Amino acid sequence: MAAENKEIPVVSIVGKSDTGKTTLIEKIIPELTGRGYRVATIKHDVHGFEIDHKGKDSWRHKKAGASTTILSSPRQVAVVEDVEKDHEIAELRDKYIRNVDIILTEGFKKSRHPKIEVFRADLEGNIIFRNDEKLTAVVGDKPPDVNVPCFNRNDVNGIVDLIEARFLR
């Protein structure tokens, strides 16, 4: 089912820290793949990250000055590339992602892509993206007063039904 010559749809899972964004994505992925879709994810980390391990050969390549290092095995490929700016989702999609039907992102709060906000009433007073025209749904423990579909965080089938209807057909 992988998208070939059309733009791959992107859905951003957004919300404040500790609301369950990663947990929701972990539940959505197997439901989508179980329905036959291929899924890519992009996680934004404002704090930076280290994918490599000190002392490993690829780490030593980077430490020696390589601007790009590719780790390749029979089962996976990883690219570690120095960048001078934060990349937009479209740039990452166009450069690194192919042969998938949908991209789920986490942490790209400023993106112009459709958003599903994860909400916890005990952590937040208000929905962050209430007035964002790209807000597609809210997932949480207590339905807020918004003009988009609201789902309980355990209603993975309902959430994926919405994603499938809006972005995959």
Residue ranges and their predicted role:
Residues K27-E84:
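N-terminal phosphate/diphosphate-binding loop that engages ATP/GTP or pyrophosphate donors
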Residues V10, T41, T69-L71, K115, ...:
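Conserved beta-strand scaffold positions in the cores of enzyme catalytic domains, especially
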Residues K21:
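Conserved lysine of the Walker
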Residues I102-R169:
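Phosphate/Mg2+-binding loops and adjacent switch elements
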Residues E81-K110:
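Phosphate-binding/switch loop-helix module in NTP-utilizing enzymes
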Residues K16, H44-D45, K54, S73-P74, ...:
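Fold-independent oxyanion-binding glycine-rich loops
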